[in-house]
Amino acid sequence: MGLNSHAPTGPIEQAWDKHKFELKLINPANKRKYNIIVVGSGLAGGAAAASLGELGYNVQCFCYQDSPRRAHSIAAQGGINAAKNYHNDGDSIFRLFYDTVKGGDFRSREANVYRLAQVSVNIIDQCVAQGVPFAREYGGLLDNRSFGGAQVSRTFYARGQTGQQLLLGAYQALERQIGLGTVTMNERTEMLDLIVVDGQARGIVTRDLCDGKIEVHIGDAVVLATGGYGNVFYLSTNAKGCNATAIWRAYKRGALFANPCFTQIHPTCIPVAGEYQSKLTLMSESLRNDGRIWVPKTPGDKRPPASIPEDERDYYLERRYPSFGNLVPRDIASRAAKAECDSGRGVGETGLGVYLDFSEAIKRLGKQKIAERYGNLFEMYERITGENPYEVPMRIYPAI
């Protein structure tokens, strides 16, 4: 079986518009005759079910949690990118497309990335309409900040709780459609198998997690929005419920993995504290906006960070990548941090960590401004490690 993405061909700027125009449309009065199954109720699944229901389709949404609000999307922190160019710093749909492809080490499927950049502008408007409280500037306009892999400010955020606020917005839209009768919600239900007819997914087999009842659900289309498979790695920030079983069952029915190693690696996780610890805590990528990453220049230097003078510190990302500084793409920052630790310059008891220092940003902007941006993240870090990041540098290490 060959891998066929069914991505449109031709000049990339016109490919999707041409593809959409050539698709067969469904009359609004006929949409209620179609049944769509959505497996998963996080940001992707919940938003898809709500949007499809609002368009007029009959939707059945399934999740194994007690409520869609229990989805792991709540763990996303830093923000969501969109090419709105509010800061007038040269951003555009093509620049977002280019930065995303480059940040993916040129392994991404370019047609899909371009479509993502195209719809990013509308996604922000949809989120605002759903009531997502994005941060705003003093004049009331939506604020932006920078993220890794970009030289423009295009990230819309809600402090360090962007995923939670986006999920609440999608959940409210989903509940509205449930109330209107276009979406039927099936909680505490696990997908056991995918039903494939002539190469197309036409339904699922489910098990009720309360009474064990097994049922078959048939539809005209199936949307799998069940999250990633990061828990196949030992060190992971994913919840234990992110078990990748739906992906595996789709694979057994003939779905192909285009690039199984293409998982998201975060360079800003709290390092392991014990030999048998596998569940890690993610700190937001947005921290790299104001935090400076460094290690001691001398391998094996175990002095407290405050005792290491400035000329004995190596701000290795700023040294190697002056154009991006600490905002290099995640895989580059992760590889660089691991290389420093492997060379013996890692910090902390285990040596698996680098410093993320906010002392300069606090001097420049003031403690109150830093607290406004990252206060909840600093509180979470102190609760887990017992260290105050306003006074001592954070310690971070890459993880899935």
Regions found by a protein language model. Name each.
Residues 128-213, 225, 269-280:
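Conserved redox-cofactor binding core of oxidoreductases
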Residues 81-116:
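Glycine-rich active-site loop/strand segments that organize a redox cofactor
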Residues 1-36, 54:
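Extreme N-terminal leader/targeting segments of oxidoreductases
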Residues 53-77:
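Glycine-rich FAD pyrophosphate-binding loop
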Residues 34-61:
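N-terminal Rossmann-like FAD-binding beta1-loop-alpha1 element of flavoenzymes
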Residues 31-34, 210-221:
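Core beta-strand elements of the Rossmann-like FAD/NAD(P) dinucleotide-binding domain
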Residues 249, 256-392:
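An anion/pyrophosphate-binding glycine-rich loop and adjacent beta-alpha core
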Residues 186-188, 192-207, 373-400:
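A glycine-rich dinucleotide-binding beta-alpha-beta segment and adjacent secondary-structure elements
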